[in-house]
A protein has these predicted regions:
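Short, basic-rich loop-to-helix N-cap that marks the start of a DNA-contacting helix
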Residues: 35-51
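A short, Lys/Arg-rich alpha-helix, primarily the initiator
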Residues: 1-21
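A generic structural signal for ordered secondary structure
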Residues: 17-22, 41, 46, 61-62
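Short, charged recognition helix plus adjacent turn
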Residues: 59-93
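Secretory-pathway ectodomains
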Residues: 1-2, 21-25, 49-55
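Short coil turns linking two alpha-helices in DNA-binding domains
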Residues: 14, 25-30, 42
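Short, flexible helical or helix-coil boundary motifs
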Residues: 10, 22, 36, 56, ...
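Phosphate-coordinating loops and pocket residues in cytosolic domains that bind phosphorylated ligands
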Residues: 31-34, 63
């Protein structure tokens, strides 16, 4: 799993603003970008990431190796549950 090139570019260009938003040092954000991209799946980091990249689509933020990896990581960090809880969609019958 890794961030898409577009998402990574936005964070790199605005790393100071993003680090203030998440309350971490820019060096820490830099390590996350290249060595620990799963840290962006934590809800406290995921919400600012969506705000900075200006998208609600998980596939615009991350590139996963497989659907199994995607499902496993989204469930582990409860990102999928958060997305479902905040989405205001109703099923039409």
């Amino acid at each position: 799993m890794r961030l898409t090139s577009e998402a990574r570019s936005i964070i790199v260009n605005r790393i100071a603003d993003f680090s203030i938003e998440v309350g971490k040092q820019p060096v820490t954000i830099g390590q996350w970008l290249y060595m620990r991209p799963n840290m962006f799946l934590k809800i406290e980091n995921y919400i600012p990431l969506k705000k900075f990249v200006q998208t609600d689509n998980i596939d615009d933020l991350f590139e996963f190796e497989s659907e199994e990896e995607k499902e496993t990581l989204l469930n582990k960090y409860r990102t999928l549950r958060y997305e479902q809880a905040t989405t205001n969609t109703t099923l039409k019958e």
